[in-house]
Amino acid sequence: MSDLSDTRHIPVETLTLDQAAAEHAALVREIAHHRALYYGKDAPEIADSAYDALEHRLAGLEARFPELVTPDSPTQTVGAAPSAGFGKVRHRVPMLSLDNAFTAEDVDGFVEQIARFLNLKEVDGLEFVAEPKIDGLSLSLRYENGALAQAATRGDGAEGEDVTANVRTIREIPDRLPAGAPSVLEVRGEVYMVREEFFALNRRQAEAGEKVFANPRNAAAGSLRQLDPSVTAKRPLCFFAYSWGDLSEPLGATQWEALQRLKALGFRVPAQSRLCRSKAELLDYYAGIGAGRAALPFDIDGVVYKVNRLDLQERLGFRTRTPRWATAHKFPAERAQTLLRAITIQVGRTGALTPVAELEPVTVGGVVVSRATLHNADEIARKDIRVGDTVVVQRAGDVIPQVVEVVTERRPADSAPFVFPDHCPECGSAAVREEDGAVSRCTGGLVCPAQAVERLRHFVSRNAFDIEGLGIERIQLFYDQDRIRSPADIFTLERREAQRLDRLVAMTGFGRKSVENLFRAIDARRRIPLDRFIFALGIRQVGEATAKLLARTYRSVGPWTERMAAAAAERSANPDEAKKPELVGEAYAELCAIEQIGMSVADDICAFFAEPHNRDALDALLKELEAVEDHVPPPRADGSPVAGKTVVFTGTLETMGRSEAKARAEALGAKVAGSVSGKTDYVVVGADAGSKAAKARELGLTILTEQEWLDLISQPGGV
């Protein structure tokens, strides 16, 4: 599903806002997809470490660009919505997730953050409970007056699935608690399956011709979430208790005491848990558990550290979806050796050419791996990876496993270095490598089949042509039926299908009225402003802001296309000139001279116009439009107190939304940026302003409140 190779190799700190926003949107979709598979269908497509890497990258993007954070971002939510097949249970105390630590430095950071929060001068002596992180399905058990009243999965953290009937069939979970138990007790823990029972279950499933499970976690989750409790009753499920939710009385003063109390009430708790009193002891525990991991009867994917004293847990509290007083220290990825059969080239939805290793199937960490990413041409050359090599494969932080090294002593004598293609294997267009970049990219953006659906989705999106009723599902359907293959095809659809409308209705499943409404929506977009037209073409690095700069500079579509074609011709004639645009040509130098564009963006625009397929598609599109409206300079910018100034908005504004604030500023001739730099003139801060305000203070920039900003733009020349 993923095509994040375009920018994932780029450090977050060097991304533009447009790049970050595009990657952020893709990551949100990707993570939502995998959460639905993991929590809703118990059928994950990727390793836990790969999923962790996606969330880690998303968190990094949002830390660098706080304006990208939305309430439904995976960083602000937990798990996935409950399935429609079960009743819903609202958790009285939310079932939150845990932050992850991957290195000793991460653990140091976790402990030091706690010390700073609690204002402790010494971190040694602060007690933690360390316990294995069971790889299973989270479960909450509610007991009322000693009797099991309800059992629910975690779901999205706020609402889970009612699996009470199924849980009553699990022998390790008591139906009644002994005397002295709290009148209300929610026990939280993990449903799991020991490996020996998992293998036996898979043998029985295979003999019966039924589905076999990829790993014990999937087997446990799938067994618990059966609609028929009698199926669950036949599955060897186990349960570890490690926490609690709603309580009528405390279980103890510390995490350790509470675990012992749960054990006394009849629940199994991890025998491998340990009380630790320093960072060194935490890391020793991690190393010991890791070394003995294979000998454990159940799967674990790391260890969990929790502050022992419950009063300190309460003081530390929670972030949006994770407690400050706990973290999960994950184990590194697992490795195996296998044969590299072939190297194939995949073309992603934005044109990135990604090499993929086709492998002799091998089991890595319980999952059969037959393909692995090779990232890019540089990685292949650096590691000298060749077809026929024996390679080491790792399940790590990528969407598919990766090849980490070559076993050169087993290399065939007749092997040859891999030659990376210079043309797209999908459409034959030139594949161009960006200056100072690692990714080769197909330049046939408007015609390449591998990019077509994503390009068309972008073309009709809200800030481009904004064609109502032509969403991703319809685009995919029309593309699969060979009805829409290029932007121009959208505007010829009615002409081509009008005489066979009934057939179109029958083949698409749309109602006649729906199709007629779509035709009207398409016709309504035959006129479009120049900046939206430029943005709609999906040229790499040309986001909304850059499209507006181009529209302001060239004013009309004719001059713009002519000058871009001229710049592309100049660049093609001078491909090696890397530092002086004026030596390339007049049109190219003019393009590079536009503020905030430069050679990198100019080269991507030139690559687009240098490809004949794109020019043909562009000509065909222009023939179908009534007009691409000339750019009209913003009114009353002359004399405006903010004309020519660079403005950054941060935090929540009270009197207007971010889009309105941006539009008003631009109408006054200001440039609205997404990040703070030394070139920023004004930083307007609303409620809950974050890192941008802090950076503005560090740089000594002018910081305005919302009211001060409104007062400023209300001066003569304002709107």
Curated annotation (Swiss-Prot):
InterPro entries: BRCT_dom (IPR001357), BRCT_dom_sf (IPR036420), DisA/LigA_HHH (IPR041663), DNA_ligase (IPR001679), DNA_ligase_AS (IPR018239), DNA_ligase_CS (IPR033136), DNAligase_adenylation (IPR013839), DNAligase_N (IPR013840). One of its GO terms (molecular function) is metal ion binding. The keyword Acyltransferase does not apply. Its cofactor is Mg(2+); Mn(2+). The keyword Cell membrane does not apply. CDD domains: BRCT_DNA_ligase_like, LIGANc. Zn(2+) binds at C424, C427, C442, C448. The active site is at K133 (n6-amp-lysine intermediate). Residues 637-719 form the BRCT domain. Keywords: DNA damage, DNA repair, DNA replication, Ligase, Magnesium, Manganese, Metal-binding, NAD, Zinc. One of its GO terms (biological process) is DNA replication. It is an enzyme of class 6 (ligase). It catalyses: NAD(+) + (deoxyribonucleotide)n-3'-hydroxyl + 5'-phospho-(deoxyribonucleotide)m = (deoxyribonucleotide)n+m + AMP + beta-nicotinamide D-nucleotide. GO terms for cellular component: cytosol. NAD(+) binds at D48, S49, A50, Y51, D52, S97, L98, E131, R154, E190, K306, K330. Its EC number is 6.5.1.2. NCBIfam families: dnlj, PRK07956.1. HAMAP family: DNA_ligase_A (MF_01588). Belongs to the NAD-dependent DNA ligase family. LigA subfamily. DNA ligase that catalyzes the formation of phosphodiester linkages between 5'-phosphoryl and 3'-hydroxyl groups in double-stranded DNA using NAD as a coenzyme and as the energy source for the reaction. It is essential for DNA replication and repair of damaged DNA. This is DNA ligase. It comes from Rhodospirillum centenum (strain ATCC 51521 / SW). The lineage of its organism: Bacteria, Pseudomonadati, Pseudomonadota, Alphaproteobacteria, Rhodospirillales. The gene is ligA.
